[in-house]
Amino acid sequence: MAFNLKNRHLLSLAHHSTEEIKFLVGLAADLKEAKYCGTEQPLLKGKNIALIFEKASTRTRCAFEVAAHDQGAHVTYLGPSGSHIGHKESMKDTARVLGRMYDGIEYRGFHQSVVEELAEYAGVPVFNGLTDEFHPTQMLADALTMREHAEKPFHEIKFAYVGDGRNNMGRSLLLLGAKLGMDVRIGAPEGLQPEAELVERCREWAEQSGGKVLVTASAEEAVRDVDFIHTDVWVSMGEPVESWSERVGTLLPFQINDALVKAAGNPRVKVMHCLPAFHNSETAVGAEVAKTYPELANGIEVTESVFESPACIAFDQAENRMHTIKAVLVSSLA
């Protein structure tokens, strides 16, 4: 099937076909190899990219900046306190200003509607670096990471996400698996599962791609026979601290610990996390939670023993953010 990614937005993978997603992952693998071999060619010379961050970031910002620099592009970082966006100037007006100056715009913030408004009015490609609803650049990195470690085609890969299924990772992984014909399972408490409308759409995509979709309230059922187990933090950026009290009791059965890894029944199973991870009490947040919940001192959504084991490939994921973001920029702007 013919397709053209030139000047395309990346708002969520819902707007990309199976073939387009596979192409981006393949291009990322090629660009990664070229960087490792020292043969990378800068294809974005003379391009300028604006990076709008309404949420703090380590991996996304670094990945976009390094990817752009490697390809010869220039970036301007607009942080939460460094512009008039949303305070003195609407996103619609901001889009029309930046679109006159930049060849592409990245946005990391809260509402999906904001990045979609940005795309509607900017007149240049817009890339979603994360919203509360979707995290498409992370999905491309996860797809590349799973392909590297599984050493088999996507349609033979089984993976599970356990935790809060309503957040951007749970929702995005469900979409990714359905689009790529994978066997995807979401293990989450009934009150924290993806909304029925999204599940139904993903089941339709899975039917077209040959994939499988399972949403279950049993972590053990979700991870049975999988190749990969994904998780994310239990309280996301922007949510009140009080959320911990209601989440801990509900989500503790979905913690990735030695017992849950064993329940997969696959000695080669890998554990994935988009980071940052609360796998001990060495962070300010981890220490604060451990004061109230001592049983979580050695990890919240994933335990220290699992995170520091050979099964955990979270840092391969982190590196692949840069390679896959580079693929998005090259495919759209080169």
Curated annotation (Swiss-Prot):
Q: Supply one GO molecular-function term.
A: ornithine carbamoyltransferase activity
Q: Could you tell me the EC number(s) of this protein? A: 2.1.3.3
For this UniProt record, the keywords arranged alphabetically read as follows:
Amino-acid biosynthesis, Arginine biosynthesis, Cytoplasm, Transferase
User: Which GO CC annotations does the UniProt entry carry?
Assistant: cytoplasm
Positions that bind L-ornithine: 168, 232, 236-237
Q: Which InterPro entries match?
A: Asp/Orn_carbamoyltranf_P-bd (IPR006132), Asp/Orn_carbamoylTrfase (IPR006130), Asp/Orn_carbamoylTrfase_sf (IPR036901), Asp_carbamoyltransf_Asp/Orn-bd (IPR006131), Orn/put_carbamltrans (IPR002292), OTCase_ArgI (IPR024904)
Q: Locate the residues binding carbamoyl phosphate.
A: 57-60, 108, 135-138, 274-275, 321
Q: Which GO terms describe its biological process?
A: arginine biosynthetic process via ornithine; citrulline biosynthetic process; L-arginine biosynthetic process
Describe the family membership recorded for this protein in Swiss-Prot or TrEMBL.
Answer: Belongs to the aspartate/ornithine carbamoyltransferase superfamily. OTCase family.
Function, please?
Reversibly catalyzes the transfer of the carbamoyl group from carbamoyl phosphate (CP) to the N(epsilon) atom of ornithine (ORN) to produce L-citrulline.
Protein name from the UniProt record: Ornithine carbamoyltransferase
**Species in which this protein is naturally found:** Cutibacterium acnes (strain DSM 16379 / KPA171202) (Propionibacterium acnes)
Q: What is the lineage of its organism?
A: Bacteria, Bacillati, Actinomycetota, Actinomycetes, Propionibacteriales
